[in-house]
């Protein structure tokens, strides 16, 4: 029985290793080491999923992101709101380059966010509100609030409609509200890559709670972002939260109650949402890849040696996989399209999933020769951008491949044959019809008289 229990434990541990080995190394930058204790539940959840965390102070002079041209970490967590300047090899420019090279970053700020976080936020398409500005909601605040109405509660319905990022269960109507205390974020409206993960209630605004409101707030109502994300074109991911409290043990374990309505919840929904967001930003969920691509004529198994011929019936098959619990499994979707492109798409059709899990489409090549591409461009919120192209040539028919009689030319055939028949009839009549001389006919008439 002991060996069975040991086997079950080993399997359970292996199942918990949801992260790939190559993505496990994570650098955690902190304002002070006390944050490691106040956010221990969040960090432990990462370690339980297989992440290898390296804790450093954000201004440590020995910080290194890369060594000998290779990055030491795949992910970076910045829980250092007040840092004015990073230490060592880390800087805003290096972090931006880290993202450009495919790295993932999770950042949590506060009302007193330093210049370093503000500069990095602007690089990612976000803007932190002014220093000392906090999100205020006079109608949706927690009973634990000190009187400034900055410890707010926001409904789970304000989460983005993307189950891959925030989890399907966390968006249910009966889900617990989310506890938040921090500054507001403003998204760049011209940046199509920015995702609004969590917004405030319509009654909220971001302003300095110790000052009277003399100017219109920078962020008001649903335009006040609490958590925002960026998925770059290279599929690197960045999540920015205006609240460090959101990921703390306090928000994970404390009961919450609306001060106005008195509605009580045993726990806030922060823990489940924070874990779902961390899974997404570090690539544990929402990752797709192309496993295989095949194309050939219908009835054959291999592609042609040189080129397809116009009007050939072809079969295109692509295998798409999704990372689930650290394993690549067949991806299931009903909205994946294939385009057969020569400058513009000549064919656009849906791919249907086969019994093997791959996606397949059958169509006839257009009656236009040239250089084409089989193109799959799948871009959905929460998933990595899937892009696959395969170039093929399409040639015209050889002279021995044309039909003897082309149906579309039947009118011309009829015209030609009718002309031939008409000429023949005319020639026959012209050659065999003979008129009698007029003088001879008159003499015969006189004789008869």
Swiss-Prot record:
Subcellular location(s) per record: Endoplasmic reticulum membrane
Segments on the Lumenal side according to the record's topology features: 19-412
Key word Signal present: yes
Pathway: Protein modification; protein glycosylation
Sequence ranges on the Cytoplasmic membrane side: 434-449
Quaternary state and interactors: Component of the oligosaccharyltransferase (OST) complex.
The family this protein is said to belong to: Belongs to the DDOST 48 kDa subunit family.
Functional note: Subunit of the oligosaccharyl transferase (OST) complex that catalyzes the initial transfer of a defined glycan (Glc(3)Man(9)GlcNAc(2) in eukaryotes) from the lipid carrier dolichol-pyrophosphate to an asparagine residue within an Asn-X-Ser/Thr consensus motif in nascent polypeptide chains, the first step in protein N-glycosylation. N-glycosylation occurs cotranslationally and the complex associates with the Sec61 complex at the channel-forming translocon complex that mediates protein translocation across the endoplasmic reticulum (ER). All subunits are required for a maximal enzyme activity.
Name the record gives this protein: Dolichyl-diphosphooligosaccharide--protein glycosyltransferase 48 kDa subunit
